[in-house]
Amino acid sequence: MEWSSESAAVRRHRGTAERREGEAAASHRQREASAQEDAKGVGRMWGKTENGGGSRVAKTALSEARTALALALYLLALRALVQLSLQRLVLSRTSGLQGEFDARQARDYLEHITAIGPRTTGSTENEILTVQYLLEQIKLIEAQSNSLHSISVDIQRPTGSFSIDFLGGFTSYYDNITNVVVKLEPRDGAESAILANCHFDSVANSPGASDDAVSCAVMLEVLRVMSASPEPMQHAVVFLFNGAEENVLQASHGFITQHPWASLIRAFINLEAAGVGGKELVFQTGPENPWLVQAYVSAAKHPFASVVAQEVFQSGIIPSDTDFRIYRDFGNIPGIDLAFIENGYIYHTKYDTADRILIDSIQRAGDNILAVLKHLATSDTLASSSEYRHGSMVFFDVLGLLVIAYPSRVGSIINYMVVMAVVLYLGKKLLRPKHRNANYMRDFLCGLGITFISWFTSLVTVLIIAVFISLIGQSLSWYNYFYIAVCLYGTATVAKIIFIHTLAKRFYYMNASDLYLGELFFDTSLFVHCAFLVALTYQGFCSAFMSAVWVVFPLLTKLCVYKDFKKHGAQGRFVALYLLGMFIPYLYGLYLIWAVFEMFTPILGRSGSEIPPDVVLASILAVCVMILSSYFITFIYLVNSTKKTILTLILVCAVTFLLVCSGAFFPYSSNPESPKPKRVFLQHVSRTFHNLEGSVVKRDSGIWINGFDYTGMSHVTPHIPEINDTIRAHCEEDAPLCGFPWYLPVHFLIRKNWYLPAPEVSPRNPAHFRLVSKEKMPWDSIKLTFEATGPSHMSFYVRTHKGSTLSQWSLGNGIPVTSRGGDYFVFYSHGLQASAWRFWIEVQVSEEQAEGMVTVAIAAHYLSGENKRSSQLDALKKKFPDWSFPSAWVSTYSLFVF
């Protein structure tokens, strides 16, 4: 018993000693592990518990729900600020004051012009009625003008030709078109002038209120105010009301290359439209001549300008062009290009009416144009502007309140200074012993890889969704409801980014602390934006300033909140300070993103049948999400979980996807307040094909139907069953441009079209085309001289045969320009009256062929008057649903072989 008792005591003593030794050993092992971990990466241990466990400290983890809600509310608040700035069209009202622009008077001009109706070049409405109205108003303005000024008026009717690298390239010829030119100058005259340009013509079947009658109305009112002003002018102001811009910039070419006043012009302001109302955006300046941007910055009362828009437009991804190109390329004159960009859904449609343009839109445009023209008319720089032709400008407005502008070379210096700051910031981290020894570089590089993987996989995901939706025939479901695109593609992108980073956090960085990872991924985002800054600056893009903004403010924010972040961890105070520091880049980012979608979304409804709009929009939206989420990635590593957020995003995306697939969202709208019509072009055409002997080998007639978006006629067929795939048009392989009367060379954009059989059309003014002469030239080429007569708009097509080349012609600069696909396209128009169009082409024949050397065709387009209509065309138009806009006219097509 005693032995047993003694043994028990010994055992208790030994057990206690063993426990103490075990605890000491465990403590020693823990310290060793901690030391080893420190050697591996002290930074990775931020926020660890005192016992060295691997779990994250609760106090450093942000609440998932609260963080997600805070970020969502933050972005919504910024979006609300952007919307507020866009709705505030004028900063101060001056309408009605003596010597100020009066929008009510300008609206009166606008309503009178649009009341005339569609104004196509060559029509009575354009060449007589509109011109008469303009001359009447100019005469009244002249009667009220101040004796300090002199007003001269000239009606120009130029004839000319040029080639243009637009829509794949083609040549333009015009005859007897109309320009109304007004010169306002000091009584003693002036040796230099500033040009203000608008166009009063419109596309067929549209009143053209925004494009471009409102600009002409603004110019009339500016002319009235300036001519009545008691303030002396140093230079002249030439107001050009051109009557053939919609004919691919013909009237501006006629003015700048032929008018005697053109030699006075030192700079210009071009007023255009790609939408209806809203703010007019400065989207092109120069080339070079930074003094022009400075003039706008100094004078404009309601600025709205962006060098980003300029570089996007000049990249060619927007299928449009303006008179700016003509003055720049053919006149070698610098200028400013402005355009209304809001509500492009009704641009070039019957809905482009005067009542849709707000009075404040007219007021702000008038205030700006008047102020800038006054500034330039008294500028010492204008007369010797060539001396100031150096470099380009970085310019951007801040919510329409002011414009910041500086030379691009200064911008490059600033950008590289910002890059150096980032290099110092990251270099300092790498030089810290704890980071050098902790494989910070490895974690950083892995973080970059994870970020790029998340972006790539998210882009692939939304593209798969977009392609699937396109294949099942549900494209453009977001066209009438843009939030559908956000709920479908935006949520998918965000969910995939969060998912990839959550996997990295759980399986790769499982032993790293939240705070360490939060800082690490801030650094990776900073580095990515810095890399973009370097690339854009090196390539000479002025829009690199945006990347600089997305580097400077986040870096300053990080430096300001770093101590608080280290001391207190990721808490509400940190989130508030962090979001406050990101205010400027995110606000301006959303501001630009709005502009991008305001321009591109309507364009995708008229971009042709070959470009899947969902793929384009999904890509743009995914890139925007990547940019906006870049500095929010850090929160993925600071929250306690992301499960609910991912599930919510997936749920929203899945529900939207199912609704889209079921056809719940119809793309188009006939809502009178905000119509978003489907564009369809109808041409009742009679075609005649001749062989080499001149005999007719084929003759047919029908209504040629082109849908200008990716959905084709799928939504129209239920309303008009006869328009179905059984009448799909077939390409005539041996004929230029597939044997159809293309108004412009957009055949590569619209390959899906329909040909509904219909009776032959017989216009009262039929087109005539004949070979005048065929001559063999001394240099072994064949010169073919042709003569054509017909309506105000015609198209001429040429295709050379094997062994033949088109060496020269009497059009443009004499050098034939091929269109996309290898054929030659000539756009012809004339004013109210014109003589026969005579021209020649010269064909070099290296090898004679039995089928001849060249095939030519001519199409006549009847865009105005009674000739534009046919009973079959009218009957078909009536069948189209009210959510569509069918633009219709009559055409003839004749093909010949020589």
Swiss-Prot record:
Question: According to the UniProt topology, which residue ranges lie Cytoplasmic?
Answer: 1-66, 415-451, 502-515, 563-573, 637-645
Q: Which residues are glycosylated?
A: 176, 724
The places in or outside the cell where this protein is found are: Endoplasmic reticulum membrane
PTM-bearing positions, type N-acetylmethionine = 1
Q: What does this protein do?
A: Within the ovary, required for the organization of somatic cells and oocytes into discrete follicular structures.
Concerning its family, UniProt says: Belongs to the peptidase M28 family.
Q: What is this protein called?
A: Endoplasmic reticulum metallopeptidase 1
